[in-house]
Amino acid sequence: AYYLRALSNLEKEQPFFQELFGQDVSKYDVTRLKRAYNDFLLISNRFKGSKYANDAENRLVFLRNSMANHEVYIANYYLKRGAFIASSERAKYMLETYPGAPASKEALIILIESYNKLGSTNLAIESAKVLTTNFSNYTYTIDKNDLVVIKDKSVDPVVEESSFFDFGLF
């Protein structure tokens, strides 16, 4: 019964058109995802060894990551609209609530950018240290305006390739 309830909450959150068009469920209300998460967590904890427990644990990972992505989506929304305190609070909440989630990198970058916009250089530096410690392909520097600048070492600078049009033929 718990398993069916969890599946029901999960399926209500993933309608046919969202799956068909590849929409990200984390961009919408996650109330049902949270309910499904709690139901699958109950199954995982209470019914260890059952045929549903393994599936429940796999779905817990998906749901946790979806809810973490939702928090990052909201934090980014606030950041784009200039609500830097709200953005930083949402990113911190994501990092505290879903530690180790794949969206942690994005949350830290949002946190750094929010702190830069708020003029909180020390907090931006602390966040940059966490980012560079956990994601070794990132480095940071402090520019002349006391802003933390993040660089992803894995991204190559854009190299302009010559093309047919470069030879003056067109």
Go through each PLM region and give its residues.
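Acidic, polar-rich low-complexity tracts and alpha-helical solenoid repeat scaffolds
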Residues: 1-170
